[in-house]
Amino acid sequence: MKHAENEYLNLCRHVMEHGTKKEDRTGTGTVSVFGYQMRFDLSKGFPLLTTKRVPFRLVASELLWFMKGDTNIRYLLQHNNNIWNEWAFKSWVESDEYTGPDMTDFGLRSQQDEEFKVQYDKQMELFKKNVLEDDDFSNKYGYLGDVYGKQWRAWKTTAGETLDQLKDVIEMIKKTPDSRRLIVSAWNPEDVPSMALPPCHTLFQFYVADGKLSCQLYQRSGDIFLGIPFNIASYSLLTHLIAHECGLEVGEFVHTIGDAHIYTNHFEQVEKQLAREPRPFPKLTLNPDVKSVFDFEMEDLTIEGYDPHPAIKAPVAV
């Protein structure tokens, strides 16, 4: 039987073989395709990729952060999650208050210049310490703008009210499961210019059939090697959590990507991953005593039977 991970591996192959060379915002360069879809049957295992280690702890803590409506990296740092650091750090080193060494283009320079990387690492550690320990600094520079959590939980209306999209969609799933309006959007055009990173995973929709909850994500932009493995696991986890509260089984996670791209400095890593054979997907177990999705904490989420190939490191394009 075909392993479900081939959905992702086939995406990698397709883009490597048929992708168009494009320039990008980060200056790194990519090959990309437009419009690609993958499907994962969540009843047959939790799609945490096995051809390289994907850290479930980071996936889960980021999702819980989104669900809390938080937009400050302090919560993530408190959970030893550094995946958003670079975007907050960028706003700090570009501010008038920053007086340290020049950090222009720190993403590329830290990959190419060992001497600069030492300076960068030192400044990043100081930045993280300040976010964790200084409330005023954290409020100003740990804040990422009105990113995912704010849009999910407190979308501002023109009337000055706030909409809790995530809470509302859960109630709709319970009361009107056949609705075609089971949608949450993170793309708020008015807020996009002030966000540290405009939403890559833009909009998701739920679908209930035969007692099963499915989810489709539309992702405007997908970093295939680093980002998409996280997105697959994150929205699969979200589907499990909401199905749990609503008394449903899990169905499919459908992942639709607009610009699906591989950065040119990830080619070697992708080839290494493609040479590996997938292993069985793990099982996700949720604490049955937790009834609301908003009450889950890290200790309530357990992954069992995860035996991946080793991690493959790659630089992040900022």
UniProtKB/Swiss-Prot annotation:
The keyword Iron-sulfur belongs to this UniProt entry's keyword annotation: no
A biological process from GO: methylation
Coiled-coil stretches noted in the UniProt entry, renumbered to this chain: none
EC number(s) recorded for this UniProt protein: 2.1.1.45
Enzyme class: transferase
Amino-acid positions noted as binding (6R)-5,10-methylene-5,6,7,8-tetrahydrofolate in the UniProt annotation, renumbered to this chain: 223, 317
Catalytic activity: dUMP + (6R)-5,10-methylene-5,6,7,8-tetrahydrofolate = 7,8-dihydrofolate + dTMP
UniProt xrefs under InterPro entries: Thymidate_synth/dCMP_Mease, Thymidate_synth/dCMP_Mease_dom, Thymidate_synth/dCMP_Mease_sf, Thymidylate_synthase, Thymidylate_synthase_AS
GO molecular function, one term: thymidylate synthase activity
Catalytic residues in the record: 200
SUPFAM superfamilies per record: Thymidylate synthase/dCMP hydroxymethylase
Chain positions recorded as dUMP binding sites: 25, 180-181, 220-223, 231, 261-263
Keywords: Cytoplasm, Methyltransferase, Nucleotide biosynthesis, Transferase
Biochemical pathway: Pyrimidine metabolism; dTTP biosynthesis
Protein localization: Cytoplasm
Gene Ontology CC, one term: cytosol
Xref: Pfam families: Thymidylat_synt (PF00303)
Assembly and oligomerization: Homodimer.
HAMAP family: Thymidy_synth_bact
NCBIfam families on file: PRK01827.1-2, thym_sym
Entry similarity comment: Belongs to the thymidylate synthase family. Bacterial-type ThyA subfamily.
Its job: Catalyzes the reductive methylation of 2'-deoxyuridine-5'-monophosphate (dUMP) to 2'-deoxythymidine-5'-monophosphate (dTMP) while utilizing 5,10-methylenetetrahydrofolate (mTHF) as the methyl donor and reductant in the reaction, yielding dihydrofolate (DHF) as a by-product. This enzymatic reaction provides an intracellular de novo source of dTMP, an essential precursor for DNA biosynthesis.
Name of the protein this chain belongs to: Thymidylate synthase
Organism field: Bacillus cereus (strain ZK / E33L)
Gene: thyA
